[in-house]
From Swiss-Prot:
Catalysed reactions, as listed in the record: (S)-malate + NAD(+) = pyruvate + CO2 + NADH; oxaloacetate + H(+) = pyruvate + CO2
E.C. numbers: 1.1.1.38
Organism annotation: Erwinia tasmaniensis (strain DSM 17950 / CFBP 7177 / CIP 109463 / NCPPB 4357 / Et1/99)
GO MF term list: malate dehydrogenase (decarboxylating) (NAD+) activity; metal ion binding; NAD binding; oxaloacetate decarboxylase activity
Name of the protein in question: NAD-dependent malic enzyme
């Protein structure tokens, strides 16, 4: 993707010498000019040749290619990020498609598992429960003062890998890298945070290299109070910050979102971001298949907070297309490890109970068991769309996929579980079992599939299509909250960008290299929705567009001038 880098005014910098070279946001390395080397006491600290950022990026790209292992590539890129952030993001701009799977899913999963082993340098804030009396001081200690986006995790449900303790910090770091690379939010405005509340991962507790608090996870009132102390401190330190909850366990994710969504500008990417990108993909896929979403039946494998969040967004879209609430809910089937959720099942969570099927409507189903399996649901409900958010590999079996294809000529199948090792079925298998007829979108990146002399691109239904645009839209519009209407606007804007819909061919979602343009379109839709919802000051579309452009940071070096502290 060709990018234009405009020159901007000079920055006045109080740092000099080795201190300046150790400041990742300001370090230029070999690109410091002769004048800057003289002014900032850098003579002798750098090689003679003054390089451009493109020359630096070319060297870094060649070094990157020398690594054969993705985990080593991840460590290498993180090292660049921790020494020269501008170069890091220029490198991503030049090679986003190749590097996104390295800095985030799927490679980030292994980086979280081995966080304490590969640890090189501090980034972000580690807020531990034993140190809870000093939370306000910790926020003051942050190296970035004007924070606009925080991604926070407690490390309990990292991707499909479970409890990783403070190793979960790899997720906020990676996520915020994408806020910048895809959404243009300056790295100077981002802050990753891990809440260290202990870990129940015995392997970590026994690991002599583990750097977190060696204690079983706190729960209940202790946990709730600790999280609340953190959020109140954030409100005091940065009242207008966008706070993204990331990879909290199901038992905490929804309660935290419900408690704080009307108090601070926040959202949960696992619930709302996943729902928004999935809905956008489904709207586009339904259009490509020649119909509307309200005409489809949808079955989910996985009825946790993420799956139920997606289901509620689908129902909201179906209602906007003309269905009643009851009609829309009757078209959505939730299956978990115990089978189809029905009104006869005990001990359902609150967010699950709204998504049950009425037992009376299932009386004519062909099944030998009281518990209705995914195969039973596919055979009897005859869904058009099947979505996997189970975190368990291989559960979309050949029998199930072929059964679905019997009654649906162009099934939409979305195995969304991350990382790749947890996917419910591979695109190659799905295309083989449907004779190339399925529309497939996955949560992790997969190469195009060749089937009978035709190549099918596989859309990656990745939250990175959504959350950077949401963040940019919130910042540009000055939104004080993230509303359901803003998320719905993001989904519809993403659907409008579908190459398959607009061009009649290609993937359901845009190419990764087009993601910055997509983020700007989503930001505009989100900003307008925020104004309509009354959570942002109403402006003209032109003013909002200029605000988006002004807040879109590009990785280019600025000229520096010396000033005193």
């Amino acid at each position: 993707m060709e990018l234009e880098y405009e020159s901007k005014r000079s920055l006045y910098i109080p740092y000099a010498g080795p201190i300046l070279l150790e400041f990742p946001l300001l370090n230029k390395g070999s690109a410091f000019s002769i004048e800057e080397r003289n002014d900032f006491n850098l003579n002798g600290l750098l090689p003679e040749t003054v390089e451009s950022i493109e020359e630096q990026a070319e060297r870094a790209w060649r070094q990157f290619q020398d690594f054969k292992n993705n985990n080593d590539k991840h460590v290498y890129l993180r090292n660049i990020q921790d020494t020269n952030e501008t170069l890091f993001y220029r490198l991503l701009d030049n090679h986003l498609e190749e590097m996104m799977p390295i800095i985030y899913t799927p490679t980030v999963g292994a980086a979280c598992e081995h966080f304490s082993e590969i640890y090189r340098r501090a980034r972000g804030l580690f807020i531990s429960y034993p140190n809870r009396a000093n939370i306000e001081d910790m926020l003051q200690n942050a190296t970035k003062q004007n924070v606009k986006v925080i991604v926070v995790t407690d490390g309990e449900r990292i991707l499909g890998l479970g409890d990783q303790g403070i190793g979960g910090m790899g997720i906020p770091i990676g996520k915020l890298s994408l806020y910048t690379a895809c959404g243009g939010i300056s790295p100077a405005y981002t802050l990753p945070v891990v809440l260290d509340v202990g870990t129940n991962n015995q392997q970590l507790l026994n690991d002599p290299l583990y750097m977190g608090w060696r204690h079983p996870r706190i729960t209940g009132e202790e946990y709730d109070n600790f999280v609340n102390e953190f959020i109140q401190a954030v409100k005091s330190r940065w009242p207008n910050v966008l706070l993204q909850f990331e990879d909290f366990a199901q038992k905490n994710a929804m309660p935290l979102l419900e408690r704080y969504r009307d108090e601070v500008c926040c959202f949960n990417d696992d619930i709302q971001g996943t729902a928004a990108v999935t809905l956008g993909t489904l709207i586009a896929a339904s259009r490509a298949a020649g119909g509307k979403l309200c005409e489809q039946k949808v079955v989910f494998l996985g009825a946790g907070s993420a799956g139920c969040g997606i289901a509620e967004q689908i129902i909201a879209q179906m209602k906007s297309e003309g269905l009643s609430d009851e009609e829309a809910r009757a078209r959505v089937f939730m299956v978990d490890r115990f089978g189809l959720l029905t009104d006869r099942l005990p001990n359902l969570l609150n967010f699950q109970s709204r998504l049950v099927q009425k037992s009376d409507s299932l009386s004519g189903w062909d099944s030998a068991n009281d518990s209705l399996s995914l195969l039973d649901v596919v055979r009897n409900a005859k869904p058009d769309i099947m979505i996997g958010v189970s975190g368990q590999p291989g559960l979309f079996s050949e029998e199930i996929v072929r059964e679905m294809h019997k009654h649906c000529t162009r099934p939409i199948i979305m195995p969304l579980s991350n990382p790749t090792s947890r996917v419910e079925a591979t695109p190659q298998d799905i295309m083989a079992w449907t004779d190339g007829c399925a529309l497939v979108a996955t949560g992790s990146p997969f190469s195009p599939v060749s089937w009978k002399d035709k190549t099918y691109p596989i859309a990656q239904c990745n939250n990175s299509y959504i959350f950077p645009g949401i963040g940019l839209g919130v910042i540009a519009s000055g939104a004080s909250r993230v509303t359901d209407s803003m998320l719905m606007a993001a989904s519809r804007a993403l659907a409008d960008c579908s190459p398959l819909v607009n061009d009649g061919e290609g993937p359901v979602l845009p190419e990764v290299n087009d993601i910055q343009g997509v983020s700007k379109i989503i930001a505009m839709a989100v900003g307008k929705a925020a104004q309509l919802a009354g959570v942002a000051v109403v402006t003209s579309e032109d003013v909002l567009s200029k605000a988006i452009a002004a807040n879109f940071w590009l990785p280019q070096y600025r000229n520096y001038r010396r000033t005193s502290i």
